[in-house]
């Protein structure tokens, strides 16, 4: 933010504008329109494949391992949303039968699938693979596929799952050792898993990788499933590109690139985030609302972080709290642009939701936005005063400025199943939401620390931690990493039945945590610098279709 505060806006203010790179995409997505003939052709071919897949799923008399493998393959191929009821019923039956297995592969796959679907299966299933000292048997080292599944299972652990801490360490060491000597496609699958475990990955990104890099190359592949998955991916991609074209036109009409040149132009990356929250066709309206919200709050973030003066930001904060277009005259010209755009956007949301009698829920998102802006203003005050708060004070403010309370709430707007009671539950910051927010905060803080430090910000999470605990930068980052691990256990716990809201409404909260893991992988700021991280994902999901 600018450090000079003046009473007269006519006076020239020297602003330390952050030098953000322009959009990588230009007008690339602006003019896409669905080829209805191709879309209809894909949809017609999908129907019989879908029914064949359903028949495979509900067939009886299969071995446990074959049933689990089929479900896992369908989920990894990104087509399980067609069969949620069938899969849940099968897993419910398996769980209630106390199904067990003697081999590592089946046990680990059983454990992960049940946990990911909310069934609290005991980690004691793994005790048979330990020796008398409680260590995993070295004889397992040669079972690479079993180890890979043990590794993936270890990431759904909760606080009560100490055995899975050992499982993670054991499987990681042996997979790293085995990886260079494996044949394709297992080699690629192991290398990818070590880089990005399945449970913390963005579902569409994982699906794209699995179809193209793994399943197509597997000798044992099922051609019905593969064909179905490719057609479904390409058909959904058309819908996603159409949504992005709509949002790109909205963004271009706002013309923030010209009128607010200090801010990041990242509407495509914002769409990737919304797509990470939910990709299924029934959430089209929800996605468009969410991407517009993320794009808008990004502008507000940069206004506080890289442009506004203290006095301007205080006035802007007050105007947002009042939420009244008549407040606009108090603002400097550049702030009038975003203020009007924000109020217009929420009027549009109310209008859009009114036909379903849901316009009243928009107020929940507005209150969350007011909260974010209040907390942005606190951060800007700390910056100008050179104040470094204790870690606890820092976090009490900084959790809201992740925008994740706000985005989780916004993600429910276009979800037709979300009721007033669900919004009330979310407004109380339940533990699972708190966990997702903490994951975002500490991963973001670690990745952006050096850049924020170079811009003179001392009230960063890492700096506050270093001072509070008298530790080095690396030790502070390790503490933050440990906070993320603890939060993941809380989040995983929050997915276990019985849950206060439906699994459908918990999934966006989980996916928000996944997105931040992917965007800031290897401590890179993939949002500010998308060329480093997000560009290949965006190309894979929104530019290149899968060859049929």
Swiss-Prot record:
The keyword Electron transport does not apply. Pathway: Secondary metabolite biosynthesis; terpenoid biosynthesis. Its EC number is 4.2.3.61. Gene3D superfamilies: Farnesyl Diphosphate Synthase, Terpene synthase, N-terminal domain. GO terms for molecular function: 5-epi-aristolochene synthase activity; magnesium ion binding; terpene synthase activity. GO terms for cellular component: cytoplasm. Keywords: Cytoplasm, Lyase, Magnesium, Metal-binding, Plant defense. GO terms for biological process: defense response; diterpenoid biosynthetic process. It is found in: Cytoplasm. It catalyses: (2E,6E)-farnesyl diphosphate = (+)-5-epi-aristolochene + diphosphate. Mg(2+) 2 binds at residues 301, 305. Mg(2+) 1 binds at residues 301, 305. A motif (DDXXD motif) lies at residues 301-305. Mg(2+) 3 binds at residues 444, 448, 452. Its cofactor is Mg(2+). Monomer. Belongs to the terpene synthase family. Catalyzes the cyclization of trans,trans-farnesyl diphosphate (FPP) to the bicyclic intermediate 5-epi-aristolochene, initial step in the conversion of FPP to the sesquiterpenoid antifungal phytoalexin capsidiol. Produces germacrene A as an enzyme-bound intermediate that is not released by the enzyme, but is further cyclized to produce the bicyclic 5-epi-aristolochene. The Asp-Asp-Xaa-Xaa-Asp/Glu (DDXXD/E) motif is important for the catalytic activity, presumably through binding to Mg(2+). This is Probable 5-epi-aristolochene synthase 4. The lineage of its organism: Eukaryota, Viridiplantae, Streptophyta, Embryophyta, Tracheophyta.
């Amino acid at each position: 933010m600018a450090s000079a505060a003046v009473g007269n806006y006519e006076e020239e203010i020297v602003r330390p504008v952050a030098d953000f790179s322009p959009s990588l995409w230009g007008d690339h997505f602006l003019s896409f329109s669905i080829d209805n003939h191709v879309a209809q052709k894909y949809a017609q071919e999908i129907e019989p494949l879908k029914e064949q897949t359903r028949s495979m799923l509900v067939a009886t008399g299969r071995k446990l391992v074959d049933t689990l493998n089929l479900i896992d393959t369908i989920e990894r191929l990104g087509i399980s949303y067609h069969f949620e009821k069938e899969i849940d019923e099968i897993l419910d039956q398996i769980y209630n039968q106390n199904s067990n297995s003697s081999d590592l592969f089946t046990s680990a796959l059983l454990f992960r699938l049940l946990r990911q679907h909310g069934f609290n299966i005991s980690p004691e299933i793994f005790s048979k693979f330990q020796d008398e000292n409680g260590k995993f048997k070295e004889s397992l080292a040669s079972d690479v596929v079993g180890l890979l599944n043990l590794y993936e299972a270890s990431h759904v652990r909760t606080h009560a799952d100490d055995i899975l801490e050992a499982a993670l360490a054991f499987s990681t060491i042996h997979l790293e050792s085995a990886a260079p000597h494996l044949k394709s496609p297992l080699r690629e699958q192991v290398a990818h898993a070590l880089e990005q475990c399945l449970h913390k990955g963005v579902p569409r990104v994982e699906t794209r990788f699995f179809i193209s890099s793994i399943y197509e190359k597997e000798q044992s592949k099922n051609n019905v499933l593969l064909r179905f998955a490719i057609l479904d991916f390409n058909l959904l991609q058309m819908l996603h590109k159409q949504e992005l074209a709509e949002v790109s036109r909205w963004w271009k009409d706002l013309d923030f690139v010209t009128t607010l040149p200090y801010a990041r132009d990242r509407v495509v990356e914002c769409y990737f985030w919304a797509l990470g929250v939910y990709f299924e066709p029934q959430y089209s309206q929800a996605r468009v609302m969410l991407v517009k919200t993320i794009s808008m709050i990004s502008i507000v973030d940069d206004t506080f972080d890289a442009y506004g003066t203290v006095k301007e930001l205080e006035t802007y904060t007050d105007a947002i709290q009042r939420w009244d277009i008549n407040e606009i005259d108090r603002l400097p010209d550049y702030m009038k642009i975003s203020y009007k755009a924000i109020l217009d956007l929420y009027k549009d949301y109310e209008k859009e939701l009114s036909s379903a009698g849901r316009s009243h829920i928009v107020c929940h998102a507005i209150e969350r936005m007011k909260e974010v802006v209040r907390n942005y203003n606190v951060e800007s005050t700390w910056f100008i005063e050179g104040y470094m708060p204790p870690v606890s004070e820092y976090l009490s403010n900084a959790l809201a400025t992740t925008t994740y309370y706000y985005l989780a709430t916004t993600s429910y707007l276009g979800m037709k199943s979300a009721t007033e009671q669900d919004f009330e539950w979310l407004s109380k910051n339940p533990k699972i939401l708190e966990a997702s927010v903490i994951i975002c905060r500490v991963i973001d803080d670690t990745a952006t620390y050096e850049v924020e430090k170079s811009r003179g910000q001392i009230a960063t999470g890492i700096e506050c931690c270093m001072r509070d605990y008298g530790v080095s930068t690396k030790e502070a980052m390790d503490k933050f990493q440990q906070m993320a691990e603890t939060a993941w256990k809380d989040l995983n716990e929050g997915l276990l039945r019985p849950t206060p809201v439906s699994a459908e409404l918990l999934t966006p909260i989980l996916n928000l945590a996944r997105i931040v893991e992917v965007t800031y992988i290897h401590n890179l700021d993939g949002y500010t610098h998308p060329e480093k991280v997000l560009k290949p994902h965006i190309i894979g999901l929104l530019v290149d279709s899968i060859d049929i």
